[in-house]
């Protein structure tokens, strides 16, 4: 009898991001650290913002109907002919960061994409800050939590790579 393990959501996210050869490892860590905080470490793409709002933020990146990223995501689903999923949410961000979806790049700003990519060349910490500040732009960034999440993300990645 063989035992098969079911991949955790964070493992699935990591493996999906690693499929894109143009994504810098620092940027992958930054995306995952931000996702950890945005989802409360569940890495569940259906995560809904807690609170009393009638239009809560949603998903891996807490796409906010009031901030424009949610509407952009709806446009991306139409553009990519995809259904809502973790992969679709990740693909949208990757397509923006790799400048493969012009509408998304224009929405977040070419300069902001450049800042994130330049930060990723330096370190995962710089990339985490830049992605939060220039792409997500949360009301309360909790930057110390995002930076602390890098340690856990790196441990998870190390474990995933050891198993593979």
Per-region residue spans from a language model:
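Cell-wall glycan-active module
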Residues: 1-11, 15, 20-21, 29, ...
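Loop/turn elements at helix/coil->beta-strand transitions in domains of secreted/extracellular proteins
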Residues: 23-29, 88, 126
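Short, functionally critical alpha-helical segments immediately adjacent to catalytic or ligand/cofactor-binding
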Residues: 26-42, 93, 130-132
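Extracellular structured ligand-interaction cores
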Residues: 29, 58-60, 128
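Active-site or metal-binding loop neighborhoods of secreted/extracellular toxin and effector enzymes
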Residues: 116-164
């Amino acid at each position: 009898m063989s035992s098969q393990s079911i991949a955790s959501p964070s493992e699935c996210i990591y493996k999906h991001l690693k499929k894109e050869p143009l994504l810098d490892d620092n940027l992958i860590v930054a995306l995952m650290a931000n996702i950890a905080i945005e989802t409360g470490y569940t890495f569940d793409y259906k995560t809904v913002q807690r609170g009393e709002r009638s239009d809560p933020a949603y998903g891996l990146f807490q796409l906010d109907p009031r901030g424009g990223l949610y509407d952009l995501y709806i446009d991306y689903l139409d553009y990519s002919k995809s259904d809502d999923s973790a992969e679709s949410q990740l693909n949208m961000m990757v397509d923006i960061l790799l400048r493969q979806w012009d509408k998304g790049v224009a929405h977040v700003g070419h300069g902001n994409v450049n800042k994130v990519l330049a930060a990723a060349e330096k370190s995962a910490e710089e990339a985490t800050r830049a992605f939060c500040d220039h792409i997500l732009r949360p009301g309360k960034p909790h930057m110390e939590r995002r930076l602390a999440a890098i340690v856990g993300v790196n441990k998870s990645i190390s474990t995933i790579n050891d198993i593979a």
